[in-house]
Amino acid sequence: MPGVKYNAPMTPAVRPPSIFRRAFAVLGWTDASNVLLGGFFLIVFIIAYIWWPLAEQVIAYIDWRGQWWLYFDWLLVGIFLIMTLTIIARADLRRDLLIVFVGMCGGLVIEAWGTRTNLWHYFTAERPPLWIIPAWPIASLSIERITRLFNWGIGKVSHKPEEAGPSGSIFFKWSYWIIFIVFFGLMLPFIAPTFDEPYTIIALLLCVVLIATPTDYRYSVLTFLAGTGLGYFLELWGTTRQCWTYYTFQTPPLFAVLAHGMAAVAFWRAGLLVRVIWGKLVDRLHFRRGNAPDPEI
């Protein structure tokens, strides 16, 4: 009969991807995600191993023989899961190693400033404690992912070309100045008791320079919001568990929450500066190699 094919080759059945593969695809899992996730768990293991007495104090609060779920630190677990999921999303080692480097250096500077000026102190009385420093680059990676998600979402829903551009619309320009002027207004009275400290003056001047020289209004606002959002839960956990305490004894102070947004913007701007400097160094090195005399002549 016409149109009927005999002995047609059988096509193999295509199995749908497993739920794990679909989840990895949604998260944007890459080869670099394996490296970052392994490094993340390695840092957690090292901290728990070296500072095991601190981990024992946390575990001791839980009554494992009774209603342990009432004493379990669900907030910490939630923060841990959010950070884990975000740092593996669309991971790129070339970009992320710079974020880790800037976050580590910046976190060390911020913790040294805060603990040495007694704006806050840790229950271990270290100034600053080394075990808290790795939290900064991990948070920086998480904030970078959240910011890119915000930026992607705005690009999807925006129908105006100027809103999808690098600088953003007039809305982001106004939002930028309102947000950072309010932040600076909260910063001054909070750090006023330490105006006699050189660290505070340097921190204040750095904030003034960063605020007064915006490079991308939209991305600055989104980074600030992402840092503030994550910073709220970090500060809520740390201050209510008395892991660290501010001199105002607030749990947490509004300025401390917003300061995470400012730190995120500062780290992002520092990363841009490092890229520019590194690019110029590489170009100059290549230029010198290109103009070097041939030893065989």
Predicted segments with their positions:
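Aromatic-rich, lipid-facing transmembrane alpha helices and their immediate juxtamembrane interface loops
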Residues: 2-297
